């Protein structure tokens, strides 16, 4: 039975909606545990199902225990999404994500660390750590200060924790003058954020000048900054979970104002 997932590198678990789980006839495992799904600022309880078969583009997925939760998903033109494809599945592979061309390729993890992908476009290589939640985390520099970031294709906008923003010299008065937006997490939570313009964000050797970044109180366990879809949408990236490296192409367009 085909299902449509949102590619979400920031989600720790792959999640089906209750409606999708019922449609495909997914069954609960013999032994169940109390689990929770964590969002940007909250969590909600989940249950689990065992899939008889799970493939993506013809590639068999070895991990077939999937979470079921009423996750908050964005609207797409062809109808409702059936869930999130998260890091618990992605981490079995080296993942080549070409967002400008709307394409993803799953590669078997190499027996030795990948030297570099065979891309025509220029890119940067980033050494990372790998958290308990299967996030590849790595240092970036925001206004000259080293902080820790993850890539989250499920996040609409790049977001920084309020605590780190304050450490960078952003005051409450400055944030009060910034534009207010509402962030919605997959766990159903809503968070008020302020969009603040910083001087420079440096990822690898690739610098973005005058980036606009949302500042919000976040429930992040392994990062200070979430690099969202606004940052990665014009880039190609290779996530090598086995060798703990990320290869990131340079943006097709950079803000100059």
Please report, for each region that a protein language model flagged, where it lies by residue:
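Pepsin/retropepsin-fold aspartyl endopeptidases
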Residues: 1-257
């Amino acid at each position: 039975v085909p299902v449509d997932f949102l590619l979400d590198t920031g989600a720790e678990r792959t999640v089906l909606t209750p409606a999708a789980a019922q449609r495909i006839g997914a069954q609960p495992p013999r032994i169940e545990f109390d689990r929770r799904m964590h969002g940007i600022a909250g969590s909600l309880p989940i249950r689990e199902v065992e899939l008889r078969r799970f493939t993506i583009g013809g590639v068999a997925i070895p991990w077939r225990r999937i979470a079921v939760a009423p996750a908050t998903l964005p609207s797409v033109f062809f109808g409702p999404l059936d869930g999130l494809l998260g890091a618990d599945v992605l981490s079995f592979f080296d993942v080549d994500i070409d967002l400008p061309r709307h394409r993803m390729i799953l590669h078997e993890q190499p027996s030795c660390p990948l030297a570099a992908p065979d891309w025509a476009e220029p890119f940067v290589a980033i050494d990372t750590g790998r958290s308990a939640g299967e996030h590849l985390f790595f240092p970036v520099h925001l206004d000259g200060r080293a902080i820790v970031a993850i890539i989250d294709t499920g996040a609409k906008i790049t977001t920084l924790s309020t605590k780190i923003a304050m450490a960078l010299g952003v005051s409450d008065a400055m944030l009060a003058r910034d534009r207010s937006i509402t962030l919605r997490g997959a766990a159903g939570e809503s968070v008020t954020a302020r969009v603040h313009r910083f001087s420079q964000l440096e990822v690898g050797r690739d610098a973005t000048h005058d980036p606009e970044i949302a500042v919000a109180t976040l429930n992040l366990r392994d990062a200070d900054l979430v690099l969202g879809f606004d940052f990665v949408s014009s880039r190609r990236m290779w996530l090598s979970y086995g060798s703990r490296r990320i290869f990131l192409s340079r943006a097709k367009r950079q803000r100059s104002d």
